[in-house]
Structure formats: C-alpha cells, structure tokens
Design a protein with these regions (language model features):
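Cytoplasmic juxtamembrane interface segments
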Residues: 120-137, 182, 213, 291-313
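Alpha-helical segments in transporter systems
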Residues: 28, 32, 245, 363-364
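Hydrophobic alpha-helical transmembrane segments of multi-pass membrane transport proteins
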Residues: 38-41, 181-261
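Extracytoplasmic/periplasmic domains immediately adjacent to an N-terminal transmembrane anchor
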Residues: 1-190, 385, 392-393
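Residues that define the loop-to-transmembrane-helix transition and helix capping
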Residues: 26-27, 236, 302
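Membrane-spanning alpha-helical segments of multipass transporters and channels
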Residues: 64, 248, 252, 256-260, ...
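Alpha-helical membrane-protein architecture signal
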Residues: 8, 12-16, 192, 231-232, ...
C-alpha cells in the first residue's frame, strides 16, 4: 500500500514539475494554445464562402454578335466565374493567363452565329490554367457547361425552326435527365471538405513536436536524471507525469475545435459531437505515443524533431482526404495505416458524415489503440538515453 502511495506521490510531483515548465516557457504556450487557435481561425475563415467565387476569366469574342454577347453574359452569371476582361486576340489572352491576371479565357470564333444557324458546326474553345488546380477545375467546369449549353441552344433553335415542340426538342437534346445528389457535403463546400481533416492534422503535428521537444530538451539541458529521480527511477511514471498535463491541454483544444466546427459553424455531424470528441481523445493519445516512439528511436532533439515534422507533414498527403488511398500505389495503401491521421479521417467519415455507429469503425479505433501501445517497445531504450546519453551541441 505504501509503495502504491509513493508512486502516486511521485506521479503528482512529476506533473507539478511539468506544469511549472509549461508556464515558464512561452514556446509551450505558443505551440499548445496560440498556434492551434490561429490555425482554427485561419483555415475556417480562409474558406468561409465554401467555394471560390468570381474567379477572374477573360473572353475573346471575335464574333461580336448578339448570340456571342449572350454567351458571355451567361458565362459571367456563373457564381464561380467572373468575366473581368475582353481581349481582341488569343495572344493577349494567353499573356494575361501567363501573368496570372486571369485563370482562363473563353474563345468565340468569328461567324459563330451565322455558322450555327446554317448548321456548319462552329467550334468554341476555352483554355484554363491548371497550374492552379482548384481555380482551373472550377473554370473548366463552368466553361464546359457553357459550351454544352450553347450547343444545346443552337440545336434547339434548329429544331424549333423545323416545327418541333418544346417537349420534342428537349427529348431529343436530353433523352436522359441526370439528377445528381452529392452525399454528405451537398453544398460542395471546400471548407467542410478540408477543415475537418486539416485542423486535426495540424493539432497532431503540434502534438508530435511538443512531445518530442519536451522529452528531448530534458536530455539537452541535462535534467533527465533529475526527472527520473523524481519519478522513483520509473520511466513509466516519468512519462505519465510529464505528458498528462499535455494531454489535458491538447484535449481541451480538441474539444474546442469540435465545438467550433460542429456547434458554431454547423458542419455535418450526423452521429452527434460526442463520438467525434472521443475520436479526438484517441488521436491526442495516439499522437503523444507516436512522439514517444520518435524520440525513443532517435534520442536526439534535432533528429527527433525532424522525424516528428516529417511524419506529420506526410500524414496530410497519405491520409486520403486530398487524394483517395484506394487510387494510390499498393505499397502506399499499406503504409497509410502507419499514420494516426488516416484512422481519424476514416472515423470522421463514418461518424460525422455517414452517421454510422462507433462499432462500425472498430478497426480504426483498434489501430489508434495499437499506436498507444507502441511506446512499450522503446521505453527501455529511452530510459538508457535519459541516463547515459550526453547531448553534443
């Protein structure tokens, strides 16, 4: 009984020591509170309109007829496209694209109206700058739709001239009507698409780096032995006492972004907020344990921080929210399971978007639990580094 009491006392003393270190170093305040809050506000306000609006586009109207002017007005009416300039030739429009003044231009050839009425199949061209993927894709979609509508309008006029009724003309032009229903994000809101994974990913990256730094700086400042002595030479008590205050702070930040996204901004959350808060707690604990593995594998502050930043940044690319994992190379598909953010993303899809029960995501919760068990493989190596390793500047 006394032995257990001594362990609790040692744990409390280590926690008090770590709390004093947290409040005495502004770096901790910045990385654990200020940086996450800044990222929350930055990403959500950066894409507050959901989709980019009025992307600058140009028009080269060589026909200058009532038909071509009507096409330009209709193109400008699309919410994502804003016609900001008219050019006299393709060369000037191309130069404007290269200079970044516009993201694309719509080319209407001379004689469009006359050739359309005489059924000589005039060609409409449009050019978009795919160096900017989102802007180029949105402009391409609008310009392609405008081209199809123009072709349909010309064909409908010909059918009307031949005596077809409106129903007959529309049945010929569009024999199959497509009714689209985007699931989970029907507004096609980029903020919903990105922020639900970017914000937890940034928090995970900061947890990696703060965990590695808080342990590595003990080696650098040669206070590791004092830390171990305070924990009765138990590496488990030492790590628990050091990281529990971090867990509390990061979990509070996690609760805050969940309330902010799903309560204040009303992002889709079909299973309720509590499963997402639990998933956030699992992500925080898994990220801390990964940080222990990183500094235990490379017990040098420089190498440990490099490992943490590299692993954290790769997580954004391989987690599957920007490019589907199923379309990746099979090797990368397997490697994606080595990143906690990947499993959090799958939980988010199941819980928040699809509204499934937590039992449906049991494999992802088990994966995060396995991440929490990983420090047991490096604790003895880490303890040796804390006792014997000498930091070389």
């Amino acid at each position: 009984m006394k032995e257990r009491k001594k362990k609790y006392v040692a744990l409390w003393q280590v926690m008090q020591r770590e709390c004093r270190r947290l409040v005495s170093r502004p770096l901790y305040l910045f990385c654990m509170v200020i940086a996450p809050l800044f990222c929350y506000l930055f990403f959500t306000t950066l894409m507050d309109s959901g989709l980019p609006q009025n992307l600058p586009a140009g028009v080269v109207d060589m026909d200058d007829s009532s038909t071509s002017r009507n096409i330009v007005r209709n193109l400008d009416a699309f919410s994502q496209t804003g016609v900001v300039a008219h050019y006299s030739n393709v060369t000037d429009a191309r130069i404007a694209v290269q200079e970044g003044k516009i993201y694309g231009f719509f080319y209407i050839p001379k004689g469009l109206s006359a050739e359309a009425q005489s059924q000589r199949q005039p060609k409409i061209s449009f050019y978009t700058n795919y160096s900017y993927l989102i802007a180029g894709s949105l402009l391409f979609r609008d310009m392609k739709m405008m081209g199809e509508l123009t072709a349909g309008s010309a064909a409908r006029s010909v059918l009307y001239a031949k005596g077809a009724t409106e129903d007959q003309a529309m049945g010929f032009l569009q024999p199959i009507v497509i009714d689209t229903h985007p699931l989970n994000n029907p507004w096609l809101n980029y903020s919903v698409y990105l922020c639900n994974t970017l914000i937890p990913g940034v928090l995970m990256l900061l947890i990696f780096m703060v965990t590695v730094y808080s342990i590595g700086v003990e080696i650098k400042d040669r206070t590791a032995r004092e830390w171990l002595r305070m924990s009765n030479n138990s590496i488990y008590i030492a790590l628990a006492g050091k990281l529990l205050p971090h867990t509390v702070v990061f979990f509070i930040m996690g609760i805050f972004y969940n309330v902010y996204l799903y309560g204040f901004l009303h992002f889709p959350c079909n299973s309720g907020i509590f499963p997402m808060i639990f998933a956030t707690l699992c992500l925080v604990l898994a990220s801390q344990c990964c940080g222990i593995v990183m500094i235990g594998t490379l017990p040098t502050l420089r190498l440990g921080l490099s490992f943490a930043s590299l692993w954290g940044v790769i997580s954004f690319s391989i987690s599957g929210f920007s490019f589907p994992v199923m379309a990746m190379n099979p090797v990368l598909q397997a490697l994606s399971n080595l990143f906690p953010l990947r499993h959090y993303f799958l939980i988010y899809v199941d819980q928040a978007l699809n509204g499934y029960s937590m039992a449906y995501s049991w494999s992802n919760y088990m994966a995060l639990l396995i991440f929490m068990m990983l420090p047991f493989s490096v604790v003895h190596r880490l303890k040796e580094a804390l006792v014997y390793y000498k930091y070389i500047p």
